[in-house]
Regions:
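Intracellular loop-helix junctions on the cytosolic face of multi-pass helical membrane proteins
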Residues: 49-64, 75, 87-242, 256, ...
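Short extramembrane helix-to-coil loop segments that connect adjacent transmembrane helices in Major
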Residues: 1, 251-260, 392-395
Length: 425
């Protein structure tokens, strides 16, 4: 819970980045601060692992180091999101407004590059971490991690990008965000009845209120477009999942194991990066709602093999073609894995397009919070569906109905939002 708190109050960091320059800088200075905090976290973890930091117990040092890493990451993430909206000019050299389609396409390509960099970094760390851990001790591995903030510092030195937008600090966002974080922490630690529902309701109320504050100065047409954009993003991200029942079933009935699931995850991650690169043109040049529509359709179609496996599809394919459940799962993971990554591009493009001058970091942070709240809505739906279709370890009689229900909801809700509001964004 503690490590998720900085992400929960991300709008606080966004407000600071938007309105509080440090040494005259609202971008580069915060990147340096984030890098410094990250470096401190690495040093604390190295000291805890190596035993040369003794001012606190090792477990407390690990928590402190991890918290510093998260804070540094959040600060740099907030700045990067704001800069991703600023790098594309909205006006040509003559001062005329550029065509919206061109701006959207370029913003989309920026998001593609950002996601590619993030995915490549995750794959690189996953590949190197095990190898480094086999050669060096833990303290040395953490010290090698100082390369990461060093790259940020080099970027600040080489690229002198800076915003000239200035506005006063909005204490409603800053104070409200901190109070919101405290309330979420109290609900999470206090074992309150219906705690998840309470957190969801409070989050929606706070985020929607802050979005109204941030967009208050915009014209009515733009505010309506932002509202419809928010509804589409929420609907697309709020799809329920099956829960643990299907995973248990694959272990108990199909006899999948940890090694096979590791292969599935590695295959999915690599193919997601490749698909993001291959489909970058379609993701950025077609309309956002068109891309989201077809991604929702594809997600539904690619859910069918999982349903088929439950009803014996693998037995038929084994008899007819010679390949069974593992082959179907591997092919399905390879084809379905890019969808989550691909769907982020049009969603982030919509957010970047409507980022308001002077509120870019705060806006992006609030919309990221909205997407996270949508995931909570999906988790609540998952919980309720599992109460209707009860699936326990070893009792999978209702798993088929649960799979069908989640697939239908995952299709109808986003498609309905796109059909109703897609033409207005």
């Amino acid at each position: 819970m503690w490590l998720s708190l900085p992400w929960t109050v991300k709008m606080v960091f966004g407000e600071l980045v938007d309105s509080v320059p440090i040494l005259g800088s609202q971008r580069r200075s915060y990147i340096l601060i984030g890098a410094a905090v990250t470096a401190c976290g690495m040093l604390v973890l190295a000291g805890a692992a190596g035993g040369w930091l003794t001012f606190a117990r090792a477990d407390h040092l690990y928590v402190l180091g991890a918290m510093l890493l998260v804070i540094g990451t959040v600060v740099q993430n907030v700045v990067a999101e704001a800069m991703s909206t600023e790098v594309v000019p909205r006006r040509d050299p003559a001062g005329n407004a550029r065509p919206e389609d061109d701006v959207r396409a370029e913003l989309g390509m920026v998001q593609v590059i950002s996601r590619l960099a993030l995915s490549a970094g995750v794959l690189a760390v996953a590949g190197l971490s095990g190898w480094l851990a086999s050669i060096f001790d833990r303290a040395s591995v953490f010290l090698l991690g100082l390369v990461v903030p060093a790259i940020s510092v080099i970027g600040v030195v080489l690229i002198r990008s800076e915003t000239h937008e200035r506005r006063p600090l909005d204490w409603r966002i800053l104070g409200g965000g901190m109070a919101f974080g405290a309330a979420i922490l109290a609900l999470a630690l206090g074992s309150v009845p219906f705690g998840q529902e309470s957190i969801f309701t409070l989050s929606m109320a706070v985020i929607c209120t802050m979005l109204v504050i941030v967009t208050r100065e915009l014209d009515a047409k733009t505010r309506r477009a932002i509202l419809f954009t928010s509804v589409i993003i929420f609907a697309f991200r709020a799809s329920p999942s099956v829960g643990d029942g299907y995973f248990w079933w694959t272990l108990d009935v199909l006899k999948f194991d940890g090694a096979f699931y590791g292969t599935l995850r590695q295959t999915a991650a690599i193919i997601a990066v490749a698909a993001l690169w291959l489909f970058s043109k379609q993701l950025t040049e077609y309309s956002v709602t068109t891309v989201l529509f077809w991604l929702a359709m594809a997600g539904t179609v690619l859910s069918l093999p999982n349903i088929g496996l439950f009803y014996g599809l693998h037995e038929w394919t084994q008899a007819m073609f010679g390949y069974g459940a593992r082959s179907i799962a591997l092919v399905n993971a390879a084809t379905a894995s890019p969808l989550a990554e691909l769907s982020m591009i049009p969603l982030l493009t919509l957010i970047a397009f409507y980022a308001t001058p002077g509120h870019r970091a705060t806006w992006f942070a609030l919309m990221a919070s909205l997407m996270n709240t949508a995931l909570v809505a999906g988790q609540l739906q998952t919980k309720y569906l599992n109460q209707i279709f009860v699936v326990d370890r070893g009792d999978y009689a209702e798993l088929g109905s649960l799979l069908i229900a989640t697939t239908v909801i995952g299709l109808i809700v986003p498609i309905a939002a796109i059909v109703l509001f897609g033409r207005r964004v």
